[in-house]
A protein has these predicted regions:
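Hydrophobic residues in alpha-helical membrane-spanning segments
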Residues: 50, 91-92, 174, 194
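Conserved mid-domain beta->alpha element of the FAD-binding
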Residues: 58, 64-144
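Histidine-centered active-site/metal-ligand motif
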Residues: 23, 67, 87, 200, ...
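Helical substrate-recognition/capping region of FAD-dependent monooxygenase/halogenase enzymes
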Residues: 45, 113-202, 208-209
């Protein structure tokens, strides 16, 4: 679960990982000193509403800046970029790694065909065409969620805040460029349909569990 804590004093994001790991992200406030975040006592004080020294181990603490950006070109001859090299996004959706995996999944089978001499090098041109809009859309959604979080924090302080985006779309855009562009099949380039199962869950939710 990815949980956004809209505390105007210090917004926080935390999520559950594998094997009992928890990841917390706190906003660095203007009054903070970077030296504070090198102090374990300071870190434990931030974590104290959720976990304590006697029931957790602090494995790592780091300060970083996040960005919302996307490269204009993902290929130069035999060099292709993917993941954070191609696009960077705020952490509000936890979607950065997923976007990178989609990049590589798109590339892997195309490179495999190239090595088998079953496709020409031009197939690599479809990589950016198919992934660019998805990555750009995901970045826009993470920005939207960030604006919503800012709005909740501002409202908690009694301030008026009107984010440009009031929500975010639940469905990824379909692939409109690349290999499927000239296909006459009406379903090509769209996500796999998710029928309702007997448990009243979507198929991908049942499979994931």
């Amino acid at each position: 679960a990815l949980i956004q804590v809209c505390d105007p004093k210090r917004p926080c994001t935390f999520l559950h990982g594998r094997r009992g790991h928890l990841r917390f992200e706190f906003r660095v406030m203007p009054e903070d000193s970077m030296e504070d975040f090198k102090n374990d006592d300071y870190i434990w004080n931030l974590l104290s509403p959720w976990i304590k020294r006697d029931n957790a181990v602090l494995e790592r603490a780091a300060v970083y800046k996040f960005h919302a950006c996307i490269a204009e070109n993902w290929r130069d001859k035999n060099v292709l970029i993917a993941g954070d090299a191609a696009h960077q996004m705020p952490p509000f959706m936890g979607a950065g790694m997923g976007a990178g995996i989609r990049d590589v999944a798109n590339l892997a089978w195309k490179i495999h065909l190239l090595f088998q001499n079953k496709a020409s090098h031009t197939i690599l041109n479809t990589y950016m065409h198919e992934r660019f809009n998805h990555a750009k859309w995901t970045i826009a959604q993470t920005i939207s969620i960030g604006e919503i979080i800012e709005g909740f924090c501002a409202a908690a302080e009694g301030k008026e805040y009107n984010p440009k985006s009031r929500g975010y779309a639940a469905q990824f855009p379909h692939i409109s460029e690349g290999i499927y562009k000239n296909s006459n099949n009406g379903i090509n380039g769209y996500p796999i349909p998710q029928p309702v199962s007997y448990t009243h869950l979507r198929a991908h939710e049942t499979i994931a569990n």
